[in-house]
Amino acid sequence: METGRQRGASAEMFAMPQGLKGSNKDGIPEDLDGNLEEPRDQESELRSQDVMDLTEGDNEASASAPPAAKRQKTDTKGKKERKPTVDAEEAQMTTLLYAMSEEQLSRYEVCRRSAFPKARIAALMQSITGRSVSENTAIAMAGIAKVLVGEVVEEALDVCEMWGETPPLQPKHLREAVRRLKPKGLFPNSNYKKIMF
């Protein structure tokens, strides 16, 4: 019965190769061991210097933030490029809001707060398709429906103004708005019949 070795392994396999002196616990020959330790020391000095540089700028960081050594480097270029466009959009939106009349501003606020109930949208989609609908799909469909209703209402308001009438909108305004939006491809043609021959 053999102990400490695998079957078929000879003592020669465990013997030290010729021409090499003893080795340390990592299996690195002693004559080469000194050369490998110097770069490790330099590397650890560089790492500690990088950590010090990171912590100097983070004196205001909260106590719940992870240590500087565990933080990952973030891409600041993308954020710098993205931020000015957001600021430009905010400035443009602010300008538009100041230019709106009181009626337009109240309509904008109502439109912004309105939403289709996602559970009902999901139930409607499920009844049409016969399959279960994910929450993300219902959210997307509710958003699309909100945009569609917004476009129909805007077109209906244009129709109402063009006809010389004043709001509130009436069904005839909505019908005319839908009729005008159909050629633009916003609504599918429900009277389409496939011609076989």
From Swiss-Prot:
CDD domains named among the record's database cross-references: HFD_TAF11
List GO terms (cellular component aspect): transcription factor TFIID complex
Q: Where is the composition biased (Basic and acidic residues)?
A: 37-50, 72-86
Q: Which GO terms describe its molecular function?
A: protein heterodimerization activity
- Output the GO biological process annotations, alphabetical, semicolon-separated: RNA polymerase II preinitiation complex assembly
The segments labelled Disordered in the record are 1-88
Q: Give the UniProt tissue specificity note.
A: Expressed in fetal brain and testis.
Which PANTHER family did the record assign? TATA-BOX BINDING PROTEIN ASSOCIATED FACTOR 11 LIKE PROTEIN 2-RELATED, TRANSCRIPTION INITIATION FACTOR TFIID SUBUNIT 11-RELATED
Q: What is this protein called?
A: TATA-box-binding protein-associated factor 11-like protein 12
Taxonomy, top ranks, is: Eukaryota, Metazoa, Chordata, Craniata, Vertebrata
